Amino acid sequence: MAAGQREARPQVSLTFEDVAVLFTWDEWRKLAPSQRNLYRDVMLENYRNLVSLGLSFTKPKVISLLQQGEDPWEVEKDSSGVSSLGCKSTPKMTKSTQTQDSFQEQIRKRLKRDEPWNFISERSCIYEEKLKKQQDKNENLQIISVAHTKILTVDRSHKNVEFGQNFYLKSVFIKQQRFAKEKTPSKCEIQRNSFKQNSNLLNQSKIKTAEKRYKCSTCEKAFIHNSSLRKHQKNHTGEKLFKCKECLKAFSQSSALIQHQRTHTGEKPYICKECGKAFSHSASLCKHLRTHTVEKCYRCKECGKSFSRRSGLFIHQKIHAQENPHKYNPGRKASSYSTSLSGSQKIHLRKKSYLCNECGNTFKSSSSLRYHQRIHTGEKPFKCSECGRAFSQSASLIQHERIHTGEKPYRCNECGKGFTSISRLNRHRIIHTGEKLYNCNECGKALSSHSTLIIHERIHTGEKPCKCKVCGKAFRQSSALIQHQRMHTGERPYKCNECDKTFRCNSSLSNHQRIHTGEKPYRCLECGMSFGQSAALIQHQRIHTGEKPFKCNTCGKTFRQSSSLIAHQRIHTGEKPYECNACGKLFSQRSSLTNHYKIHIEEDSLKADLHV
């Protein structure tokens, strides 16, 4: 009879307000843009999860605003003409505002005790209290926290003006599942009314808690769901069922394939709302957001210094290791220094447990660590059979071999041009977008990437770190040094398929191939004249602008081209490098030698006529 009464008792239904995170206007306006973006993501995901559980309720106004990309606040005028906040206008929401005010008092108390505080709705706390009371009445209810916990952490990166202290926010959404036990402890009947769509839990009638009961026999890692275990086991078996149709690269998981396909399509769905920069992976966006928030969440417990990256903390800790070598003993596993990290940082370390002792970077697998360590050791086991060039990774060799085969699997959607690597395609796309986010502090020139900015700045500093060991000549870029070294070795790895002519660099081959194709992609906007090379277009545009950037230090004469300046300087130096093979006469310019040859040709033709 008691059991029947227990079954008839109404359930505590989960509503949106139970999991909603509410802010007052003062709290909201003090949040950084990156914090607001993450709050928006959390709230929308909470709403989607509730909808997927089959709960029926009208869409909250705050969700409609967030879906439209607006702030969860609307300033409206009431009948008295006084401004009020739109999403707090109803009596129900006004009550929620009062709850928030009392909640702020609790926050102030927590801050005085230097405790972290959580923005969780008051109704959620009341809901948990109800469940606790029912448990105390021996109703044998259990709450299972499963599947999704989302944490918004902005550790000491946002100053709260009102409270006068730094704080971090946690927005935690926990899906709460209720299971009613029967008298027999080995069986349980799942309450199906509230969670009809949660099919993966309905099929598991023996679950009592969210324990990880599916264990991998190879590495003993445990999982909550059997499907997660099966995905994980593919890492050991090497099974890769998901294949890219573009380049035939295979992956063990469909999510990895989807991410990879963005390299071909160029899709970048993760956009920074601060600067508009787009990324193909959410992890890349998270890293980028740190540049705006200046978040430094890795703190040294020895001296209190903070770092935005784990590798920075690790390198810093080596200073303390020299002072106290017995205290710090960095090893192969990242857990060897995890004692110096906070709880949230240790969560990241569980995912990346292999640590590089040289630079502090962490990796998910020992194989990834071995690949990385070749950067430090200089080991290059993968050699090209065509030209003998060696590489540290097989992927780099495959990419290099495309130079010899002519394969270009990465194609630009705008102009159809093909490329051997995704990095080259991304660099090319900037031509169409015109995006230049990096400015030089010296001359104000805008550049498309941080790496090109660093190389450009060396023009002003005069730094040339790449030095040739044969002749001692120095260069600003490593690529320029590699091309130069081919002059000494005689290596010409780039071959034209039309005429078999070989070249030292890929750009020279590309320019040469336009002779065969007749392609002239560089067009002057002033007169419409087209050119096969960008350098030729730049030189031509100086005719319209009148710019003459090359100046003779001796007489002050200026020139449009560097070659014209070099030829002119020979007037002052008296240098004559061009010699006639027929009579030995010397010339300062090649064009003068060419004209001189015509004299000998005419003489030869006259002699031939006389003999006839």
From Swiss-Prot:
Question: Which InterPro entries does the entry link to?
Answer: KRAB, KRAB_dom_sf, Znf_C2H2_sf, Znf_C2H2_type
User: Which stretches of sequence are listed as region Disordered?
Assistant: 76-102, 320-340
Q: Where in the cell is it found?
A: Nucleus
Which CDD domains did the record assign? KRAB_A-box
The answer to whether UniProt assigns keyword Transcription to this entry is yes
**Membrane-crossing residue ranges in chain numbering:** none
Positions bearing the Glycyl lysine isopeptide (Lys-Gly) (interchain with G-Cter in SUMO2) cross-link: K150, K175
Question: Mind telling me which Pfam families this protein's record contains?
Answer: KRAB, zf-C2H2
All copies of the KRAB domain together span 14-85
Q: Name the Gene Ontology molecular function terms of this record.
A: chromatin binding; DNA-binding transcription factor activity, RNA polymerase II-specific; RNA polymerase II cis-regulatory region sequence-specific DNA binding; transcription corepressor activity; zinc ion binding
Q: According to the UniProt entry, which residue ranges have a biased composition of type Polar residues?
A: 80-102
Q: Which GO terms describe its cellular component?
A: nucleus
Where primarily located?
nucleus
Which SUPFAM superfamilies did the record assign? Answer: beta-beta-alpha zinc fingers, KRAB domain (Kruppel-associated box)
- Record's superkingdom? Eukaryota
Keywords of the record:
DNA-binding, Isopeptide bond, Metal-binding, Nucleus, Repeat, Transcription, Transcription regulation, Ubl conjugation, Zinc, Zinc-finger
Q: Where are the zinc fingers (C2H2-type)?
A: 214-236, 242-264, 270-292, 298-320, 354-376, 382-404, 410-432, 438-460, 466-488, 494-516, 522-544, 550-572, 578-600
Stated role: Transcriptional repressor that binds DNA upon activation by RAS proteins signal transduction to initiate transcriptional silencing through the recruitment of additional DNA-binding proteins, multisubunit complexes and chromatin-modifying activities to establish a platform for DNMT1 recruitment.
Family per similarity comment? Belongs to the krueppel C2H2-type zinc-finger protein family.
- Identification of the protein by name: Zinc finger protein 354B
Say which species the protein is native to.
Homo sapiens (Human)
